[in-house]
Amino acid sequence: MEIPVYNASGEIVKNINISEDVFGVPFNEALVHQAFVAQQANARQGTQSTKTRGEVQGSSRKIYRQKGTGNARMGTNRSPVRRHGGVAFGPRPRDFSKDLPKKMRRQAIRCVLSFKLESGELKVIDQLSFDEPKTRDMAKILTALQVISPTLIAVDNPDTNFIKSARNIPAVKTTPANLLNISDMLKNKQLVMTEEAVRQVEELWGQRSG
């Protein structure tokens, strides 16, 4: 399988062969959805908490006698129906994490990479290096490539100049190639990768590596 490689001016400079084991996988919507939900769940802290009627401050004495006042019967002022009372059935700390087998997680990444390539949402550039941080230069490159926002840029070894050149552009996110994940790729319409990043991805998620 061959794909074109662009330079910083948006011109095709060559074609490279890429692995069909990584970029030629049929799309499995159910698998990708499962992997996305698992990643989102694993990112949750699960530390939200409310106080029950047994934990809020206040007396446990019955507010007034059961009968004879004409009012509705009432117990402690810590009851959930009263102001400053405890919360009934509120959120408690819990573990939201979901386990996903390694092979399923890796196959889901291959599915998304293949879908991006097939739908024209993946572009490969020969290199992305900057002598100094220049947002203008990065913006010119993205314009020349005719990318669609939001954009995810993956490189093999991001340096400070590259990160600073891209971080001030709206709807542009950068990531090391070895940290590509389902969530970032699905949330960003366009994926831009350097040639070295493509090779790193093939090595990481090729069939021989698991």
Curated annotation (Swiss-Prot):
Molecular function via GO: rRNA binding; structural constituent of ribosome
Full protein name: Large ribosomal subunit protein uL4
InterPro entries reported for this sequence: Ribosomal_uL4, Ribosomal_uL4-like, Ribosomal_uL4_dom_sf
Gene Ontology CC annotations of this record: ribonucleoprotein complex; ribosome
Family: Belongs to the universal ribosomal protein uL4 family.
Origin organism lineage: Bacteria, Bacillati, Chloroflexota, Dehalococcoidia, Dehalococcoidales
Region (Disordered): 41-60, 67-98
Transmembrane segments: none
Subunit field text: Part of the 50S ribosomal subunit.
Presence of keyword Ribonucleoprotein: yes
UniProt keyword annotations, A-Z: Ribonucleoprotein, Ribosomal protein, RNA-binding, rRNA-binding
Origin: domain of life: Bacteria
Organism: Dehalococcoides mccartyi (strain ATCC BAA-2100 / JCM 16839 / KCTC 5957 / BAV1)
SUPFAM superfamilies: Ribosomal protein L4
Compositionally biased residues, Polar residues: 41-51
Disulphide-bridged cysteine pairs: none
Claim: Ribosomal protein is one of the keywords in the record: yes
